[in-house]
Amino acid sequence: YSQVLKLLDKEKILQISRETKGSEAYVKRFDGYQHLVVMLFGILKHFDSLRELEIGMKAEAHKLGHLGMNYLVRRSTLAEANIRRPQEFFASVYAYLLEKYAKFLADSRPAKSYKGQTHEPKDWEKLLYMMDSTTITLFDNILKGVGRHPKSGKKKGGMKVHTVMKYHVGVPMVVQLTSAAKHDHYLLKEVHLPKDSTLAMDRGYVDIAQFQRLTEEGVCYVTKMKKNLKYEVLESVMYVNTEGLVAHIDQKVRFTRGELIHEARRVEIFYANKKPVVLLTNNFDFTVEDIAEI
């Protein structure tokens, strides 16, 4: 644990805490750095409650000085800090650490030669981001009240974790927590990527207005297409393989939502023993193979 803390710049973290609105408000002793240290201690020890965390800290009381702690925090103090200190502080610390140590993270892209197969790195791999969500069911008795009542009468309780990850980094760039009932495309509104980036996502994130925003910002997206989307076909080309079978259909389509007009590329790929896959993108330069790989 002390080795982990050596990677943390205490003064920089305190600076982030002071610059985050409300992070150091009404704070006497339990500053942002000490709060971070305590929470990391609880995570690494796999504690599930503040009571466990308090007991664990007491058991390690003789080592607190080595952790940069100058006193033993009480459970009530920690509970109040969890309420008062804004999450933006921890998000800023994470962003700072990611920027500082990203170069030391393992590159998850396939090697140029692996198990006899060669892989030529593509230009788009360098700026490829992936977005997805995972639902966490909350089954403890104390958490059974979380969620909403749908028409079926069954409660959709739990949390949903929305994540944006850079392809070759392998750790989240953005993490948002919402109720399980929150629609996936919620996070899409919050995502702002560098120009010329490519964003891969599932069909749950389909939002024509946000797709137009990404296009205007110079960001490429690739996603699976929903069946119920209404669109107008502007151009259509059918490609046939050497066996005379349809390999894929490449179309330029237009979506109209009131005054909003968004033009995109619809690619339907056919397989011998599988259902066809329909993909949607705003990139008209990628090959069909690249789009399918993304």
What do the predicted segments below correspond to?
Residues Y1-E52, G56, R85, S92-V93, ...:
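Single, function-defining residue in the core of a domain
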Residues S76-E80, E99-L105, Y239:
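Short alpha-helical linear motifs
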